[in-house]
Amino acid sequence: MHIVVVSVNHKTADVSLREKLTFSESSIQQALSALINQKSILEGVILSTCNRTEIYAVTDQVHTGRYYVKSFMSEWFDVDIETIKSATDVKVGNEAIHHLFKVITGLDSIVLGETQILGQIRDSFLLAQSEGTTGTVFNKLFKDAITLAKRAHAETDISSKAVSVSYAAVELSKKILGKLENKKILIVGAGEMAELALQNLVGSGATDITVINRTAEKAKSLADQYGGRQVSLQELQCALIESDIVISSTSSQEFIITKPMMQDIMKLRKNKSLVLIDIAVPRDIDPEVNDIDLIFNYDVDDLKGLVDANLAERERAAQVIYTMIDKQVISFVDWINMLGVVPVITALREKALRIQATTMDSIDRKMPNLSERDRKVISKHMKSIINQILKDPISQAKEVSGSENRAEELQFFQEIFNITNEVESIKNNEPEVRRSKNSFVFNPEQ
């Protein structure tokens, strides 16, 4: 039994190929069914986001498992197998476990430490579980991964520091003015940077938002999407008079906001302070507005310093999380190794209990007048003797779980105690690796 992950991400393939290798939300259930019916694959989870497509599988053999996962991707996406091979990164065993933990904690994301991937993996796992394509191994592995990611974000500040200019603009606004719920915010521009700023503003509680753009239709579309209002470019000066925060991001080659304009506006504002954040290149705001009292003006260079400092803090937090990951990998591998030992220990205990029961039956026949108290005393001492005799063999069996030759050593262990048939019987009566749809469902809130 082996854990395999086949990954297509921003490091292995360009966006034009990643677009072709993406599962639509409506197709994943069907894809899971097709995946689990491939040869060699015992359990499966599919993760598909805008930046990565990953297939996690428990396989009976490493080489055949890798082959059939890639073959499945080739058939599903109608892409030749050589393209799949060149566009994928394959990890097996401990490396596959480490990869999942690294991805779910945000350490493999374009934005270091982002938290969205945690929810995406959680949803992918729960869907696979509901479809019956996970079992003993993945139910444990993904539960551990989700718990680890929550702990990593709770115990470090890796996701709390802005590492994009648009997000930094919003964080700077909060630092200067505090909560944004009652602040009047003006967005000048309707491009990608402006939209990212809007997303973060709304996420930070801002509700009073005005959008201005040279193209009114774009401004209205963006304003409607985020619950704001749109005004024309001709109303810019009126909007500046009313605003507490201005974030500007246009493609203009000239200043949109000039020093003379702001001198007039500040008089009408009755000396109320104004925060100007210019995230455009070239700049939208004349840097000479810095000479005007009560104007706090910041450009991309100011924000870049904040972003660089925050990124350095995230990287320090990442090192802490890597230590958490290493420990969790060891813990999970120990658990995996114990799966093969448990039937052996169970068989040994059951054999000892049968010997005890047979011996007690013999005592009862030969000493029929024993009182109930005497029987309990004898039984108690027999259990004590059995536990003492089994203590060292069981301890040795657990030690074997970490050995590279554990299969051979466990077989030798079974032969010494003559429990090979009992072990096979226990294995045959265990639940299948892959569970049914009605099996236990992991609750991620527990």
UniProtKB/Swiss-Prot annotation:
UniProt catalytic activity: (S)-4-amino-5-oxopentanoate + tRNA(Glu) + NADP(+) = L-glutamyl-tRNA(Glu) + NADPH + H(+)
Keyword terms: NADP, Oxidoreductase, Porphyrin biosynthesis
EC supergroup of this enzyme: oxidoreductase
EC number(s) given by UniProt: 1.2.1.70
CDD domains per record: NAD_bind_Glutamyl_tRNA_reduct
Domain of life: Bacteria
UniProt entry tagged with the keyword Zinc-finger: no
Active site: C50 (nucleophile)
Xref: InterPro entries: 4pyrrol_synth_GluRdtase, 4pyrrol_synth_GluRdtase_dimer, 4pyrrol_synth_GluRdtase_N, GluRdtase_CS, GluRdtase_dimer_dom_sf, GluRdtase_N_sf, NAD(P)-bd_dom_sf, Shikm_DH/Glu-tRNA_Rdtase
UniProt GO BP: protoporphyrinogen IX biosynthetic process
Pathway named in the protein's UniProt entry: Porphyrin-containing compound metabolism; protoporphyrin-IX biosynthesis; 5-aminolevulinate from L-glutamyl-tRNA(Glu): step 1/2
Single GO molecular function: glutamyl-tRNA reductase activity
Site positions for Important for activity: H99
Binding positions for substrate per the UniProt entry: T49, C50, N51, R52, S109, E114, T115, Q116, Q120
NADP keyword on record: yes
List of residues binding NADP(+): G189, A190, G191, E192, M193, A194
Job of this protein: Catalyzes the NADPH-dependent reduction of glutamyl-tRNA(Glu) to glutamate 1-semialdehyde (GSA).
Domain comment, as recorded: Possesses an unusual extended V-shaped dimeric structure with each monomer consisting of three distinct domains arranged along a curved 'spinal' alpha-helix. The N-terminal catalytic domain specifically recognizes the glutamate moiety of the substrate. The second domain is the NADPH-binding domain, and the third C-terminal domain is responsible for dimerization.
More info: During catalysis, the active site Cys acts as a nucleophile attacking the alpha-carbonyl group of tRNA-bound glutamate with the formation of a thioester intermediate between enzyme and glutamate, and the concomitant release of tRNA(Glu). The thioester intermediate is finally reduced by direct hydride transfer from NADPH, to form the product GSA.
Binding partners and assembly: Homodimer.
Family under the similarity heading: Belongs to the glutamyl-tRNA reductase family.
Listed name of the protein: Glutamyl-tRNA reductase
Phylogenetic placement of the source organism: Bacteria, Bacillati, Bacillota, Bacilli, Bacillales
